[in-house]
Amino acid sequence: MKTIIALSYIFCLAFAQDLPGNDNSTATLCLGHHAVPNGTLVKTITNDQIEVTNATELVQSSSTGKICDNPHRILDGINCTLIDALLGDPHCDGFQNEKWDLFVERSKAFSNCYPYDVPDYASLRSLVASSGTLEFINEGFNWTGVTQNGGSSACKRGPDNGFFSRLNWLYKSGSTYPVQNVTMPNNDNSDKLYIWGVHHPNTDKEQTDLYVQASGKVTVSTKRSQQTIIPNVGSRPWVRGLSSRVSIYWTIVKPGDILVINSNGNLIAPRGYFKMRTGKSSIMRSDAPIGTCSSECITPNGSIPNDKPFQNVNKITYGACPKYVKQNTLKLATGMRNVPEKQTRGIFGAIAGFIENGWEGMIDGWYGFRHQNSEGTGQAADLKSTQTAIDQINGKLNRVIEKTNEKFHQIEKEFSEVEGRIQDLEKYVEDTKIDLWSYNAELLVALENQHTIDLTDSEMNKLFEKTRRQLRENAEDMGNGCFKIYHKCDNACIGSIRNGTYDHDVYRDEALNNRFQIKGVELKSGYKDWILWISFAISCFLLCVVLLGFIMWACQKGNIRCNICI
């Protein structure tokens, strides 16, 4: 009895070899695209989150933590502000005649000379910073009847009382202070920057002790401008043991113009002029250390790479820098739509095309073919369609960078207290610009991502249509990205389809003949193999049960006798 059941099972297996799908006279060819187990989510115009095989981050969100000393010339202010270095504070003498691309002011900087103020501090600081030099030329001003080179215990230069090295403090000689009237023409071809000041004594006694007159006056003129300053005598908060002050002013003399200085007291006179240069130099407040490295873009947080189009490290930048945006991340799709491969393809390992899912492990191309024929299964990439897609995507990042990177610096903007409304307006304008750029950046990236996904989908469809045109009536579109080929197609035949040399006329008669031999009922469901095999297995099982029942009935009736020998 067991022998009969075993023979029945062997018969079923033998019969199974003739089921559809195991016919050596047909083959299956599927087209598909690359996929990865875990893709990257990006935003497009039509979808906030769509998964792609690869994406590049466009927002630089961190700095190196140090300011690179190359290719820009960095001048570290250390303990000196730019204005202190300009005036010649004793502890800033090392900055005389220095040059820079970027002057870095530190929070620890301090003044260590006569207390002063600059009524237009921000403008002077910006003017000198953009000039990029502290180159100073001494001139021989003719001050008559007065004592020069005044000093103070608040401004020690070594053990001696001193003063700002670029300024000349004039006071009475004996008991007189004659009116000073000095001219200095500009016969050069460049602008000259003159720094001068007015002394405001603490008391009337200090005023007359230094300048004789109870009230002094200083007038500085050129052909284009005139400034008249009257000292304000009075007590002020004590700084470094002094209650008096010096106010610093500045005048630019154009080529061919002339500087005229008139004063009857309280004049802090210039010793010469600073050369004015035009350029892209600037100043930045930062406590980041100076490091030996190379970076085109500098922020107060430190240098950052400029290989991305956007950054959210700091609004203040110097050099060729990414555009500042509010977003922490913006991802640019550099791969195709990702549809991870299903882990199981049925109990007989059926293959599927791009309409169902992508293919993982296809590392030699983005698009390719899988086949199943009498020689087994195989896979190969289609390099031409892959290269077409890559060529169009390559350079996308560089084009975005070219559109957005600033080839100039975004300097700090400062205003005096009386210009508070202007400062508020400027801040509003800057914030609006940032909001606008942030929106534009998100829109630009979404458009590029949409284009990339549409492009890669289009290349897949082009390859599928190219294959369909080759096969014509020799194959049937299975609806899942695969073709059922109705003739024997070995590996060489599959290769000819891939490389475009397939001749459908050679196989036409065989394919048509096989088409007409289709069994009576052909299931179109994607689960037809499952249903066929389950139905066949049940049929075999029932056949065995019936046969076993017949044998047992015959034995019971005596029609069949079973002898068991030991």
Swiss-Prot record:
<keyword id="KW-1170">Fusion of virus membrane with host endosomal membrane</keyword>
<comment type="subunit">
    <text>Homotrimer of disulfide-linked HA1-HA2.</text>
</comment>
<keyword id="KW-0325">Glycoprotein</keyword>
<dbReference type="GO" id="GO:0019062">
    <property type="term" value="P:virion attachment to host cell"/>
</dbReference>
<keyword id="KW-0812">Transmembrane</keyword>
<keyword id="KW-1165">Clathrin-mediated endocytosis of virus by host</keyword>
<feature type="disulfide bond">
    <location>
        <begin position="68"/>
        <end position="293"/>
    </location>
</feature>
<feature type="glycosylation site" description="N-linked (GlcNAc...) asparagine; by host">
    <location>
        <position position="79"/>
    </location>
</feature>
<feature type="disulfide bond">
    <location>
        <begin position="297"/>
        <end position="321"/>
    </location>
</feature>
<feature type="glycosylation site" description="N-linked (GlcNAc...) asparagine; by host">
    <location>
        <position position="24"/>
    </location>
</feature>
<feature type="disulfide bond" description="Interchain (between HA1 and HA2 chains)">
    <location>
        <begin position="30"/>
        <end position="482"/>
    </location>
</feature>
<keyword id="KW-0449">Lipoprotein</keyword>
<dbReference type="GO" id="GO:0046761">
    <property type="term" value="P:viral budding from plasma membrane"/>
</dbReference>
<feature type="topological domain" description="Cytoplasmic">
    <location>
        <begin position="552"/>
        <end position="566"/>
    </location>
</feature>
<feature type="glycosylation site" description="N-linked (GlcNAc...) asparagine; by host">
    <location>
        <position position="38"/>
    </location>
</feature>
<dbReference type="InterPro" id="IPR013828">
    <property type="entry name" value="Hemagglutn_HA1_a/b_dom_sf"/>
</dbReference>
<feature type="transmembrane region" description="Helical">
    <location>
        <begin position="531"/>
        <end position="551"/>
    </location>
</feature>
<feature type="disulfide bond">
    <location>
        <begin position="113"/>
        <end position="155"/>
    </location>
</feature>
<keyword id="KW-1160">Virus entry into host cell</keyword>
<keyword id="KW-0564">Palmitate</keyword>
<dbReference type="Pfam" id="PF00509">
    <property type="entry name" value="Hemagglutinin"/>
</dbReference>
<keyword id="KW-0348">Hemagglutinin</keyword>
<keyword id="KW-1043">Host membrane</keyword>
<protein>
    <recommendedName>
        <fullName>Hemagglutinin</fullName>
    </recommendedName>
</protein>
<dbReference type="GO" id="GO:0046789">
    <property type="term" value="F:host cell surface receptor binding"/>
</dbReference>
<dbReference type="GO" id="GO:0055036">
    <property type="term" value="C:virion membrane"/>
</dbReference>
<feature type="lipid moiety-binding region" description="S-palmitoyl cysteine; by host">
    <location>
        <position position="555"/>
    </location>
</feature>
<keyword id="KW-0946">Virion</keyword>
<feature type="disulfide bond">
    <location>
        <begin position="80"/>
        <end position="92"/>
    </location>
</feature>
<keyword id="KW-0261">Viral envelope protein</keyword>
<keyword id="KW-1032">Host cell membrane</keyword>
<feature type="topological domain" description="Extracellular">
    <location>
        <begin position="17"/>
        <end position="530"/>
    </location>
</feature>
<feature type="signal peptide">
    <location>
        <begin position="1"/>
        <end position="16"/>
    </location>
</feature>
<comment type="similarity">
    <text>Belongs to the influenza viruses hemagglutinin family.</text>
</comment>
<comment type="function">
    <text>Binds to sialic acid-containing receptors on the cell surface, bringing about the attachment of the virus particle to the cell. This attachment induces virion internalization either through clathrin-dependent endocytosis or through clathrin- and caveolin-independent pathway. Plays a major role in the determination of host range restriction and virulence. Class I viral fusion protein. Responsible for penetration of the virus into the cell cytoplasm by mediating the fusion of the membrane of the endocytosed virus particle with the endosomal membrane.</text>
</comment>
<keyword id="KW-1168">Fusion of virus membrane with host membrane</keyword>
<feature type="glycosylation site" description="N-linked (GlcNAc...) asparagine; by host">
    <location>
        <position position="499"/>
    </location>
</feature>
<feature type="site" description="Cleavage; by host">
    <location>
        <begin position="345"/>
        <end position="346"/>
    </location>
</feature>
<keyword id="KW-0945">Host-virus interaction</keyword>
<feature type="glycosylation site" description="N-linked (GlcNAc...) asparagine; by host">
    <location>
        <position position="181"/>
    </location>
</feature>
<keyword id="KW-0472">Membrane</keyword>
<feature type="glycosylation site" description="N-linked (GlcNAc...) asparagine; by host">
    <location>
        <position position="54"/>
    </location>
</feature>
